[in-house]
Amino acid sequence: MKVIWVLENVQDDEKVFGKLNTVLLIASIKLWKKNHPETTCVLYCDELTDRYLTRLGIKYLWDSIERINRKKDLNRSVFWAASKLEVLSEQNEPVILMDNDTLVYKPILHLIERDKHYVCNFEQGQGYYPTGLDPLVEQLSYKARWKMESVNVSFLYLPDPEFTRMYANLSLDIMEEFTRLNAPHSQYLIFAEQLLLRHLLERENKQVKSIISTYWNCQKWEWGENHNNGLWPIHESQTNFKHYGPLKVWIIKDQAGENYDREMEELINCIQMPELDMSFLLCR
């Protein structure tokens, strides 16, 4: 099984590499490798990120480091996750795509049904995602009856390479059109990345399950009802699986009950790398 991480410095600025994101990346790969040593782990990155990883001395954690092949002229400040789709567009085998802040604490592969697609969780996106009546969405060359049910892609298992490439290429095409239409914010990114994936899974009659069997309400910004099409409800998932996502902002700012020093201490204890030198990193 091939497992993929993608890390691109879209700002082309070494100063944006921070300590929290660094230890999360290390924890993500180390925990996965500990629990799934039989898998092939590949990191795709740009040249600046490669130098950053070299300075940290952590490139050995992956089985292979590959260069991201940019295919589209996109507004990367809005479509900052486009490199994940560019990587997926080149895959010729079943893959798992891991976000760099997704931690899998225990073995999980034995729970994955290999003929089904898996996402992190299902999202209820009414009032949050751009709709079919959005003036930019209306101008897309790809026409669909857009529903507001979406998926979170911080963990993806994609068993069908043909479907994976079709999804990734269409997503990139939509991002390119949105760029030409001057899409103003990253709501259009998640439309092209997450809402599109849910739409295509339904269109192609693909079976899909989630890791977390609790709906996320995007508008209310809270977890909702549980369902029976996943591995664990949110309250049970935390000892097995965690995606930090927007939580990172609160940790860095010591807000909403989060504490940066406490979280860093726990993560550093998790990765067990006393030789790690992050003194050159300027940001939390």
Predicted regions and their residues:
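Short coil/turn segments at beta-strand junctions that form active-site/ligand-binding loops
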Residues: 1, 39, 93-94, 206-208
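N-terminal anchoring/stem segment of glycosyltransferases
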Residues: 1-72, 247-284
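Short, solvent-exposed loop/turn segments at secondary-structure junctions
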Residues: 9-12, 48-51, 102-104, 124-127, ...
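Conserved glycosyltransferase catalytic-site signature
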Residues: 22-26, 81-85, 102, 190-195
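Short, hydrophobic beta-strand segments that form beta-sheet elements in well-ordered domains
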Residues: 40-47, 94-99, 118-119
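A conserved donor-nucleotide-binding helix/loop in the catalytic core
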Residues: 69-98, 105-106
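Conserved donor-nucleotide/metal-binding helix-loop-beta segment in metal-dependent transferases, i.e.
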Residues: 104-141
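Catalytic core and acceptor-binding pocket of nucleotide-sugar-dependent glycosyltransferases
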Residues: 148-247
